Amino acid sequence: MQISNLRHYPTFADTIADRGWHAWWTESGVPIENYRAHVHLMLEKDGIPAALVAHDDDRYIGSVLIIENDLDERPDYAPWIAALWVDPDFRRQGIAAQLITRSRAHIAQLGHDTCYLCATADKRPYYLKQGFTLLEEDVAGLDVFSISSG
């Protein structure tokens, strides 16, 4: 398995969009085409936004997005680790942790000291175990975390 910037493996863009939209956006009213366009923007330049993809050659395993803002209620926090996804067959193998580590490194290379993440409260134990600090609870129904990028 390797973790690559989506810019180097653009064939995974639609898969990343599909997984993310089905996991978090189906009930939002946002069309999948809009979410797909958001992911395709990550192919255009280095920096933020970006996507990292875990894969075994041409087999998708998981992905994570690095974006400017993942929570409208907290516009001052940036950048964010978002849409962390590992396909069910590959879970509990440390892949999500590796995607987080690579995201943090990418964010650090861009000169940011801290990154943020939001998740439902049931995910809190996982993110605390990964070294995140809980900043706030129940912001639009989500926990808000931070972690050093370095």
Give the predicted meaning of each segment.
Residues 87, 120:
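Residue-level recognition of the GNAT/N-acetyltransferase active site
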Residues 107-119:
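Conserved GNAT acetyl-CoA-binding A-motif
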Residues 90, 94-102:
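Conserved acetyl-CoA pyrophosphate-binding loop and the N-cap/start of the following alpha-helix
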Residues 1-16:
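A short beta-loop-alpha structural element at the N-terminal edge
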Residues 24-52, 61, 65:
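Active-site rim helix/loop that mediates acceptor-substrate recognition in acyltransferases
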